[in-house]
Amino acid sequence: MEDAHAKKWEEVVDYFGVDPERGLALEQVKKNQEKYGPNELPAEEGKSLLTLILEQFDDLLVKILLLAAIISLVLALFEEHDDEAEQLTAYVEPFVILLILIANAVVGVWQEKNAESAIEALKEYEPEMGKVIRADKTGIQKIKARDLVPGDIVEISVGDKIPADLRLISILSTTLRIDQSILTGESVSVIKHTDPVPDPRAVNQDKKNMLFSGTNVSAGKARGVVMGTGLNTAIGSIRTQMFETEEMKTPLQQKLDEFGEQLSKVISVICVAVWAINIGHFNDPAHGGSWIKGAIYYFKIAVALAVAAIPEGLPAVITTCLALGTRRMAKKNAIVRSLPSVETLGCTSVICSDKTGTLTTNQMSVSRMFVFKDIPDDAAPELYQFELTGSTYEPIGETFMQGQKINAADYDAVKEITTICMMCNDSAIDFNEYKQAFEKVGEATETALIVLGEKLNPYNLSKAGKDRRSAALVVREDMDTRWKKEFTLEFSRDRKSMSSYCVPLKAGLLSNGPKMFVKGAPEGVLDRCTHVRVGTKKVPMTPAIMDKILEVTRAYGTGRDTLRCLALATIDDPMDPKDMDIIDSTKFVKYEQNCTFVGVVGMLDPPRKEVLDAIERCRAAGIRVIVITGDNKATAEAICRRIGVFGEDENTEGMAYTGREFDDLSVEGQRDAVARSRLFARVEPFHKSKIVEYLQGMGEISAMTGDGVNDAPALKKAEIGIAMGSGTAVAKSAAEMVLADDNFSTIVAAVEEGRAIYNNMKQFIRYLISSNIGEVVSIFLTAALGLPEALIPVQLLWVNLVTDGLPATALGFNPPDLDIMNKPPRRADEGLITGWLFFRYMAIGTYVGAATVGAAAHWFMMSPTGPGLNFYQLSHHLQCTPENEYFEGIDCEIFSDPHPMTMALSVLVTIEMLNAINSLSENQSLLVMPPWSNIWLISAICLSMTLHFVILYVEILSTVFQICPLTLTEWIVVLKISFPVLLLDEVLKFVARKYTDEFSFIK
């Protein structure tokens, strides 16, 4: 049934053909069960483990590595080996590659399994049982909630979880209050009624006659007819939205995917080229004159080239850097659930923030109040107007009047204000030892009045020597010695007030007999006020006094303050309780007559004190903050002015919309509104998702905050979903990040950390890529020039994973730039490598490759311990035979000597260490940013060199890597060949500082 909230309950009951007193007949129940299905959310069909594992290998770089491993394994199995050491070496390469791929897959599967929990977490809001009236049995019967069908008559009472979406048909108590915060984000429980809500487009917050599945009954008892079950409930539609939301890759993941595609194409071309260049050498004597053996030999070189070109250490280094970033964020109260989102934070351009609890404390607090000072006969009434500080439930704050700090106990009317706040109240504050914070017990507005009374402390009670909890309750405990509450007349919609009947326990200024203390909406209470309290006197109410009260109350409720106002009053001579019918709430208004007005208090959910600075930092960082709230527009605008989202006198036209106003716009109008607006008020969950969609369409990277079940679809859809630590399990499961302290300024700190991490990641990604270019150039040169192998695959794997991996990880500890939050966010499509940088790394890579090959050639041609070959002999080494006159007097076994390979590997490792020092800064000279500015990098370089010495000088390892120890003379040659890379990069950095080229190569 559409728009049940807009129809009379009798129409709804008729639609289902149900008698509200007897319920559905069994035939109707069966028919509806067949038609609508069970009242439960379908279980999530997760991907099988095999599917998840296979998905991890659906990546070009991974496929190339896998192919390289398989080919290496096949060659190792079928090739003849001279000795056991050579055979072991042949198997090391495929084994290590497979180990890397398996580790990568395990991490990926674990992350995906975690992400699937969001939809399952919704199940916790499904109630297990429901109380139903059905024609087959008399009275109320308890059944499983899953067996409820549309048309069932359900009874609910305090403490129950609503078992399905219901249309109220009768309220069986004075009032019915529902806590629907998980669904609508409202911070206070909502009073429900049975009257139609004539607006067919009403948002869930305004459907006061509807009860939603999964929400809780705070007070009262009622009956309703089931309107929706399973997926046809409000919570079911949220499940559908979450199910339909596709996971998006982060900007970095997209960049790396594109980089992988480009790299795979380049690798394919180079591998084919190397193989093709050497077709003429397939028949060389070294291959036994066999064309097939020669083809396989050069095929192995092509495989080695593929291994050299892929930065195998990159996934591990990125994961390590992100994991370290999450640890730093956790110290700032930002708990990251999804590793890739750490980097995404760095390019966040829009933060869509919930108001309640994120920008504000979600702890109602009285900030202003007034009482009468004097009412002269011939002049306007005079007021005492008080301002109070403190924005939490801890009763610490000061009282000011006209900017001057005062002692509230000096004013007689304050004693009466405090008495009404304390006695006409069913709530309290409690100290949570675990959180070391004060919390409300009961209603937020009533708790604010309790805190006000404790702050005012009108009898100057001493708090000395008391702990935090005891000091916060001194006024409450003192009040209990002065007054005894006999009964309460609960709040009702018709009179918009509540009252308590109290008797004095000891004599005092106010306690000269029983009194009724009244609080409620100003217009409702003032209509029943005949007098006004001025100090300790009672003055008759006049139209002028009434106008003054309404004028100041309106000022409190509008403009910058937009406070929620309550009028406080007393009845000095109440009716005898024997004459009151305290069961029938329709008569309460008769008992609350002849009131004496005492004062008005104005309260709000106050902004967090650190938010103003955080918003300013966002503005400096080029990040737009959009406030999205279920609260009304006026209140939201007032808070936005206080925290700096809007200026004090800024016109908000075109920059603030309600959900209804947004819906009324055309698609183009909605897009423009999202592009400009800074506030969306009175919105529903689907509005949040729609706003995220528009932002994504504009190329913005959005962070979305939320805490309720209703926020989960938008949290899942946004690039960064941010849940509150105090939020629901569903919101936390759907989010990438959880704020332990629910604080907006924590988001800004996390964005700063994200930017720093991205900058460092750029440095080590570029470092690793330039290293791989050097390795590719090295293999290409040896193959193209016909030189002996300078590096073999197992050595390349060692360099890529261990020797390069450690300094690359250490580059993640580079200190952040001081002006990191004074720059606009980077574009999501910004390239990892610009054209100029590509040229730089090609220049460095070419030097690395040439130096590596040169080191091996140096040993063959110029070393005192080498054979002293000429270039022709070196480049035609495969033609070496005892009969060949060009190789007369040369032992052909010399080409298998481990020395030249050791020289090449040592030069490669040393150059990479110097290259890591170059990567401390993209453009800054080492004279400005010396190596010791990152002590972790120095440690990593020392460790890498130590590991290199280990494989050189530990015999079993040197056998595996086919290398040997070097002499001091040979090490001096290694350093001479390696050192110029520092000078080369310094020259390139100097050119970059003078003439920067911004066009992007990898987009």
Swiss-Prot record:
**What keywords appear on the UniProt entry?**
ATP-binding, Calcium, Calcium transport, Ion transport, Magnesium, Membrane, Nucleotide-binding, Phosphoprotein, Sarcoplasmic reticulum, Translocase, Transmembrane, Transmembrane helix, Transport
Topological region Cytoplasmic: 1-59, 111-262, 319-775, 864-898, 955-1003
Drop me one GO molecular function for this one. P-type calcium transporter activity
Q: Which residues lie on this side of the membrane: Extracellular?
A: 79-89, 283-300, 800-840, 918-934
For membrane topology, the record states: Multi-pass membrane protein
Extract the Gene3D superfamilies matched here.
Calcium-transporting ATPase, cytoplasmic domain N, Calcium-transporting ATPase, cytoplasmic transduction domain A, Calcium-transporting ATPase, transmembrane domain, HAD superfamily/HAD-like
Transmembrane feature ranges: 60-78, 90-110, 263-282, 301-318, 776-799, 841-863, 899-917, 935-954
Superkingdom of origin: Eukaryota
One GO cellular component term, please give it: sarcoplasmic reticulum membrane
The record's similarity note reads: Belongs to the cation transport ATPase (P-type) (TC 3.A.3) family.
Q: Which protein, by its recorded name, is this?
A: Calcium-transporting ATPase sarcoplasmic/endoplasmic reticulum type
What's the source species' lineage? Eukaryota, Metazoa, Ecdysozoa, Arthropoda, Crustacea
